[in-house]
Amino acid sequence: MRMILTAFLINFTTQAVAGETALAGTVTHVRDGDTIEVNNVPIRLAALDCPERGTQEGDTASKIAQQFLGSQAKCELTGATTYDRLVGYCEINDTDFGRYMMQNSACKVWEKYDVWNRY
């Protein structure tokens, strides 16, 4: 029952902010190198393609992203969604998170999804 309620709340929260263009708050969870949660809302970083967890490069990217847990984030949402995640470009502690991950890990720009030509 607790898991059902948690899933409902996450889905409801995601739907509630899906129409918004920005989200600001605390990084509450890091799923992997290109997906974080801000105020428990999952955000898929636009234009960022990181290796998957379970690979050496993916685990390293996740570990690098973990250092931002508890930091303040400001995300510009593109209006797109993927699975349970909103898609957006985020700054964490006034640093472009996508650019930081590309400079410090094996993450690369995914040009097809760089909808605002940031990278």
Report residues per predicted region.
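Small beta-barrel nucleic-acid-binding modules, primarily SNase/OB-fold domains
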Residues: 2, 11-119
